[in-house]
């Protein structure tokens, strides 16, 4: 079963003057070039890669592909073999795949898109698939590589040449599968063009990145591109989500040969979650599927994580793994770093560090913790909003915090080039009676830990796995987890 071809870019290249040799890698960043590598010089949104051709040659590039827009002229003094390619910005991924010999075609590549849940699902898929006999790699927010040995990254979905270079390296290292986060920016900027997705998951569509996309309609349209991908066999859609339910119906009409599976609590779901129970120790749920019915108990927290588990069940079973085996291995998986990450100390408040940085994600994290909160205890929420991002999201985050938490501490979260107090001022109209307003995030975290009762729960939201605070263009070391652990230790 195959999906329609997404209109990406012209795929037919002229005869390439360069063929990959063992050890030669392609890069679009001249700083990554080593002796013998190939430089791909694309026009970018802010910079023109062709300006860095001399630097790439100095670093050892022995071949250059460059963006041929009809205006650029190759300088003969550069004196290395080269080839101009039209519309290279949109075709770089496909070019790199071809130069690498399309080795990623030998991988089971699974893409995950949606506003929230991408990191958890990709990391769980990798853990589960490894236990089922695959050798699985991850490309995503927390890092790239094999589970347990991820290399840090700066983008959820890397640049197109980097994506293909990663897949090539992983295949050379024996990988058989790859679980990949596919961001809306990645889809819109052609970063995944040339990736042979076999299966794709849609998690949800809630407000985020409107500073980039402008409208929710445009945001959703970009996300949906992944499900019209050439060669896609399985579309796995959260039908509890309004946009997801609409997308699933549309795909069934548009792509009759594509296997479309809806998942969620909805009666319309093909992979339906029933008999859901939750506690501070985790959750249990029954999954009714086209492959049978089974129960899974896990230490993961939250109804939204039950949905994420259902997505994993659907993808793994669609790829041929028996349901009983899938549920058995999913019961063993660990949370992704910074996703409902618990710090437990006897006689002290439970601290949960989570990446929730959208109103929907914050609402779900808080509702999950309210469900397991001890009688008479308070749920605290420490959060802020990122600078130089969608301002309209800020009061919505404040409203989600007030609605879901008993005590709210408003602070900073990567203010970037903005004044952090200005960001807080955008949040405060929705927070009528904050427990504290504190620009210094470390002070805010310590305050919550010091003031909370022993049976209270503290959610520190927004940064999750991040180990930095971005202030005025400088990333200073900062870890919510480290600050909270130290504060708990000092509490006595």
Briefly describe each language-model feature range.
Residues 1-22, 32-38, 48-51, 257-259, ...:
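ATP-dependent carboxylate-amine ligase
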Residues 1-94, 98, 242, 269-274, ...:
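N-terminal leader/targeting and accessory segments in enzymes
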Residues 9, 90-239, 245-258, 310:
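Phosphate-binding loop of NTP-binding sites
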Residues 57-59, 75-77, 193-196, 226-231, ...:
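Short, conserved loop/helix-junction motifs that constitute active-site signature segments
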Residues 67-69, 182, 204, 239, ...:
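Short secondary-structure boundary segments
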Residues 71-73, 144-146, 186-188, 242-246, ...:
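Short, active-site-adjacent cap segments at secondary-structure transitions
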Residues 72-76, 173, 188, 197-351, ...:
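Acidic, Mg2+-coordinating active-site environments of NTP-dependent enzymes
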């Amino acid at each position: 079963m195959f999906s329609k071809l997404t209109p990406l870019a012209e795929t037919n290249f002229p005869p390439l003057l360069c063929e990959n040799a063992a050890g030669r890698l392609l890069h679009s960043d001249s700083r990554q070039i080593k002796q013998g590598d190939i430089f791909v010089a694309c026009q970018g949104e802010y910079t023109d890669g062709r300006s860095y051709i001399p630097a790439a040659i100095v670093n050892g590039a022995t071949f250059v592909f460059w963006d041929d827009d009809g205006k650029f002229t190759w300088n003969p003094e550069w004196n290395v073999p080269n080839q101009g390619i039209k519309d290279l910005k949109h075709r770089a991924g496909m070019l790199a795949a071809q130069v690498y010999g399309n080795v990623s075609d030998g991988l089971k590549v699974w893409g995950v898109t949606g506003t929230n849940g991408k990191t958890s699902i990709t990391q769980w898929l990798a853990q589960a698939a490894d236990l089922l006999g695959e050798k699985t790699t991850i490309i995503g927010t927390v890092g790239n590589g094999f589970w347990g040995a991820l290399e840090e990254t700066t983008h959820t979905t890397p640049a197109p040449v980097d994506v293909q270079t990663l897949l090539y390296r992983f295949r050379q290292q024996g990988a058989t599968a790859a679980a990949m986060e596919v961001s809306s920016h990645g889809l819109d900027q052609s970063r995944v063009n040339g990736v042979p997705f076999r299966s794709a998951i849609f998690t949800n569509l809630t407000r985020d990145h409107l500073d980039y996309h402008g409208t929710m309609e445009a945001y959703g349209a970009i996300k949906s591109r992944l499900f019209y991908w050439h060669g896609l066999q399985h579309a796995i859609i959260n039908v509890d989500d309004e946009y997801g339910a609409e997308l699933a119906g549309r795909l069934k009409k548009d792509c009759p040969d594509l296997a479309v599976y809806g998942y969620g609590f909805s009666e319309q779901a093909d992979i339906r979650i029933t008999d859901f129970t939750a506690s501070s120790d985790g959750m249990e749920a029954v999954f009714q599927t086209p492959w049978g019915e089974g129960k899974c108990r896990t230490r993961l927290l939250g109804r939204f994580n039950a949905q994420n588990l259902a997505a994993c069940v659907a993808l793994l079973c669609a790829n041929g793994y028996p349901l009983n085996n899938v549920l058995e291995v999913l019961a063993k998986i660990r949370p992704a770093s910074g996703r409902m990450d618990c710090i437990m100390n006897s006689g002290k408040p439970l601290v949960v560090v989570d990446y929730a940085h959208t109103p929907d994600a914050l609402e779900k994290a808080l509702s999950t913790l309210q469900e397991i909160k001890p009688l008479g205890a308070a749920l605290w929420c420490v959060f802020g909003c990122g600078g130089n991002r969608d301002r309209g999201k800020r009061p919505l985050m404040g409203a989600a915090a007030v609605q879901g938490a008993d005590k709210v501490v408003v602070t900073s979260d990567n203010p970037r080039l903005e004044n952090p107090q200005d960001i807080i001022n955008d949040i405060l109209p929705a927070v009528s009676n904050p427990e504290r307003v504190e620009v210094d995030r470390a002070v805010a975290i310590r305050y919550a830990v010091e003031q909370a009762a022993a049976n209270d729960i503290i959610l520190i939201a927004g940064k999750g796995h991040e180990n930095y605070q971005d202030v005025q263009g400088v990333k200073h070391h900062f870890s919510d987890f480290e600050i909270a652990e130290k504060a708990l230790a000092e509490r006595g």
